[in-house]
Amino acid sequence: MTVFYFIRHGKTEWNKASRYQGAHGDSPLLPESYQEIKLLAKHLAAIKFVHAYASPLPRALTTARTLISELPSNIPLTVDSRLREFNLGKMEGRRFDEVKARWPQVVDSFHFHADKFDNRLIDSESFSAVIDRFRAAIEEYAAAYPGSQNVLVVSHGAALNAGINGLLNVPLARLKDRGGLSNTSTTILQTADGKNFQLKKWNETDYLHKTTVDPTDTI
């Protein structure tokens, strides 16, 4: 089995401000995010990773590099644009409440009814486009590392949610059934053939030892 550990990047200033970042927006990690990445590294310390892959967007790449620096072994890192965040078009850079007021149906479908999402209304990517590029990347990694090997993938909330559910062949109408993915969370999939994937863990965050749930942590 090739086992994939999917990590969502650490929380950023725009995450905290409830502002969409997407594929073109970005903001620095919060100071506390670096401590959370250290907790993640401690959680993963016993696992031997053969390779790490990361989105080129600074918030994800910084998370990946910080995480690797905290792990006991030297893990090679490859930057792959196929792991970038969902291109959200006109939503990018805007606050959640502003976007909801301007495009209520778009926001509802994006968060809850992916099968009804019309990307043309905001000049964004479609769910199918994100799923296709994500699948192509992960299948390539699985082919490169068959057998009992562990692969680390650092990406973004919306892209990971769509891409992972795509790997699990979840229909668009059910894409949001498991809920969102939190900052610095771990989701684990395994595959024996590089084509069919099984879910082992979804949105694991216990190692962060959070006592309260901040709604801006999860998308």
Describe every region a protein language model picked out.
Residues 1-5:
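Extreme N-terminal starter segment of soluble prokaryotic enzymes
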Residues 9, 156:
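Short, conserved phosphate/pyrophosphate- and ester-handling motifs at nucleotide-, phospho-/glycolipid
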Residues 11-67, 122-135:
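Loop-to-helix element that buttresses phosphate recognition and phosphoryl-transfer chemistry
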Residues 39-108:
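Phosphate-coordination/substrate-recognition cap region in phosphate-metabolizing enzymes
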Residues 73, 88-98, 143-149, 165-219:
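Acidic, low-complexity terminal tails and accessory targeting/binding regions
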Residues 157-161, 198:
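GST superfamily/GST-like fold recognition
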